[in-house]
């Protein structure tokens, strides 16, 4: 047995976990994994979303994570917790939302956890923070820094790409339309990871001391894949000849420029401009480990975990065995 197998095989000691972001797709998968492993899980959730949790068993506490008083009074309640696991993230990625949730809400929870002597904080971050050009990336990095400097044991997990973020074109291709790519479809690559595989990785952080006090980039199994390869695989599953439509990056640049200029007169458009900038980032930057010496993305240096591949997920979507759930962060 290798060390991973030995860790998986050894008896687990149940611990008490505060779970943030349990109503998102990754959060729900993480909740199910933690419950399956026998941990005592308490979810901090907004009142309007608490009923979305499909897993029986966890205690759900209605907490406003933007309010330190609510976190202490309604959340932790002065009780003992062994760990905090956060899958919480801003819904849109716009600066105001990101600094409120990705940074300040986490700072609030960290402060309360520190006062109560919580021993471990597992944070779901994102691999894109290694090259921060956007507001939400700076917000995430600011909290990463606060966590590292807090003195709490930490595990900062930076996944590559989620299956849901790469599934936005499945339905359009099933309807007979072409697959959209930026440039030639090979500008970027990623090693996407499934919800369940990432949930296992997050839960393992509680038990595997090799993941303590570390920043952990992680992708899914297999080779890195480009958008064009994603399209080719999808057409193959449908038994059709590949059809691609190229979207010039200049189009995104034009949209960004127009919205940015218009935002001077209509400030609400600034958020739309930021969303366009986010789209351009994902269209031009690979979700892989960035080599600081060469400035290049390195698929070989990007660790892998799990068993499910994106193309297996595509097959489930095509066969109707899974439903796409893209959320707010899908490019298409």
Language-model features and meaning:
Residues 15-39:
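N-terminal Rossmann NAD(P)H-binding glycine-rich loop of SDR-like oxidoreductase domains
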Residues 26, 84, 198, 202, ...:
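Non-catalytic, hydrophobic alpha-helical segments
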Residues 49-115, 128-130:
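NAD(P)H-binding glycine-rich loop region in Rossmannoid oxidoreductase-like domains
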Residues 90-176:
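Glycine-/Pro-rich loop/turn segments that contact NAD(P) or position catalytic residues
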Residues 165-172, 205-216, 240-242:
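Glycine/proline-rich active-site loop of Rossmann-fold NAD(P)-dependent oxidoreductases
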Residues 182-188, 214-224, 238-239, 247-249, ...:
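Glycine-rich Rossmann NAD(P)(H)-binding loop
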Residues 185-206, 214, 226:
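Substrate-positioning beta->alpha
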Residues 250-332:
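A hydrophobic C-terminal alpha-helical subdomain
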């Amino acid at each position: 047995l290798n060390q991973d197998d030995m860790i998986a095989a050894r008896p687990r000691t149940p611990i008490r976990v505060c779970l943030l972001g349990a109503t998102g797709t990754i959060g729900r998968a993480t909740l199910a994994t933690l419950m399956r492993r026998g941990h005592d899980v308490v979810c901090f959730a907004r009142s309007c979303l608490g009923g979305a949790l499909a897993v029986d068993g966890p205690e759900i506490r209605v907490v406003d994570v933007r309010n330190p008083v609510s976190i202490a009074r309604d959340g932790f309640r002065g009780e003992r917790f062994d760990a905090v696991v956060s899958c919480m993230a801003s819904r849109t990625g716009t600066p105001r939302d990101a600094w409120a949730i990705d940074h300040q809400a986490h700072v609030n929870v960290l402060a309360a956890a520190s006062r109560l002597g919580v021993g471990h904080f597992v944070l779901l971050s994102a691999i894109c923070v290694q090259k921060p050009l956007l507001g939400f990336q700076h917000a995430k990095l600011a909290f990463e820094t606060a966590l590292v400097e807090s003195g709490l044991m930490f595990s900062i997990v930076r996944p590559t790409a989620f299956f849901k973020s790469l599934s936005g074109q499945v339905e359009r291709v099933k309807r007979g339309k072409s697959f959209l790519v930026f440039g030639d479809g090979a500008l970027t690559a990623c090693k996407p990871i499934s919800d369940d595989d990432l949930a296992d990785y997050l839960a393992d952080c509680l038990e595997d001391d090799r993941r303590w006090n570390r920043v952990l980039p992680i992708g899914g199994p297999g080779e890195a894949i480009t958008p064009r390869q994603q399209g080719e695989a999808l057409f193959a599953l449908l038994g059709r000849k590949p059809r691609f439509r190229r979207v010039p990056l200049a189009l995104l640049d034009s949209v960004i420029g127009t919205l940015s200029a218009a935002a001077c007169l209509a400030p609400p458009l600034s958020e739309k401009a930021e969303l366009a900038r986010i789209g351009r980032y994902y269209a031009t930057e690979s979700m892989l480990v960035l080599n600081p010496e060469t400035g290049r993305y390195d698929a070989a240096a990007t660790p892998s975990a799990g068993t499910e591949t994106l193309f297996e997920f595509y097959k489930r979507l095509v066969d109707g065995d899974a439903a796409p759930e893209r959320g707010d962060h899908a490019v298409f």
